[in-house]
Amino acid sequence: MTRPGSDIRVILFDLDNTLYPPDAGLIEAGDRLIADFIARRLDLPWDEADRLRVRLWLQYGATARGLEVEYGIPQREYFTGSLERVDVSRYISPDPDLAELLGSLPQRRFVFTNSSELYAERVLEALGVRGLFEGVFHIESSGGRPKPDSHPYDVAVQATGEQPQHMALIDDTEANLGPAAEMGMLTIKLGEAPDDPRHLHLIDLHDLPGLL
């Protein structure tokens, strides 16, 4: 029987909560700093700032984009004042098992994230896997337009030079998989089971070779 991903040549990996486990604490640390930034920048009570953070993330795919659209706050100011202040080494460390998994995959590998280039590079270096990826697609490379906007996916397809039918996307956020599936990519939901039957389900990233 042919495996669903047997003709995949390029794999796009989401970054946060995909290349490291959700219980690492890094996401929570970043969320606190984002709420801190919003509270300072908009002169809001912290709880209100945190609720705004969540609403903008749900509505725009990235809080940075929402703050830019609704409040005119440059994304560079947002990242400098929030996520790029996180000491990622407090939450994640070199992961030999992840490195072994990535190194065993014959496909070309890229990171596909809504975070900034600097933050993504720091996370990959902390995990000890930067050299195992051909490149990183980040918020700057998509012109500030985050997943699930269609533009980042178009950028990734053009930059890799591969047909979507030969590409796979792995993401823990189901909303980010829809545009990839529409393009013809193999889409893999990590963590909780997907609602959309187009997406494959993967509980543990280390089981990925069984799908490919």
Language model segments and positions:
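N-terminal helical cap/lid subdomain that shapes the substrate entry/recognition surface
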Residues: 3-13, 18-96, 118
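A generic structural signal for short
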Residues: 23, 52-53, 90, 108-109, ...
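Residue-level marker of regulatory loop/turn positions in helix-turn-helix DNA-binding domains and
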Residues: 90, 94, 112, 145
